[in-house]
Amino acid sequence: MVCRAWLQVALAMVVSLVMLPECGAAEQLDSARPVAPAAKELRVGALRVDRVLFLGNSITLHGPAPKIGWTGNWGMAASALEKDYVHVLTAQIAKAAGGMPEVKAKNIADFERNLDAFNVTEGLKDELEFQADLIIVAIGENSAALATDEAKLRFKTSFDKLLAELKRHGDPTLIVRSQFWADAAKDERMKQACLDAGGTFVDISKLGADEANFARSERKFEHAGVAGHPGDKGMQALSGELWKAIQKRATPESVKQD
């Protein structure tokens, strides 16, 4: 049953990769078409979760890159597909909802690096048309440090526009997490943009402060950049923080405890 569930998730993912700079030119990889939606409406509490979209970077999804010793096609640097945060969190959602949601995951490192030069409507055409019920935004690490007021404004404005475009397509619940490699300037601006868009911001800075959450603490890697990504423990912890945010959003205000 577990294997079948993971197969459904894998088939449901429409993958579009943007490789890390050290891995060479950008590459497109298309998987099988998404599986048909569940027969019944899926909900976690009050939160609809029929369609779930993950927008991230290499922590969310990275294709094989033999030059740096990475052979997976999932979130770097989990030891297996089912151990990255996307799949761990999807399993939690499916268990709570009583069915497997339709899932898309996309690496949008190109947005991180180009910000306002990235055409969101064209670059995320398929993802916008997907009209997800729940969107997890997990980016920031590939954006340059915000060394000037101009850079800070550009980053915030670009992030505002990204979230606004996502909100224009359907009526998604937005959850944005801070960076695994914490950066206060970027994290503060992502938080404000998220709150302005009516989303939930998840501070995961404590995860990157714990060496045990890094893949290098679990096994050896040829490339320091790969080793610096979350390992299985870090992925589990990241999923746990996001799941707590989902549960909070899923609880109607009228029944929340003070």
Question: Model-predicted segments: where are they?
Answer:
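N-terminal secretory signal peptides that target proteins for export/translocation
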Residues: 1-4
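Conserved SGNH/GDSL esterase-like catalytic core that processes O-acyl groups on lipids
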Residues: 33-53, 61-149
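Active-site segments of SGNH/GDSL-like serine hydrolases
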Residues: 136-143, 162-192, 196
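Charged helix-capping and loop-helix junction motifs
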Residues: 151-160
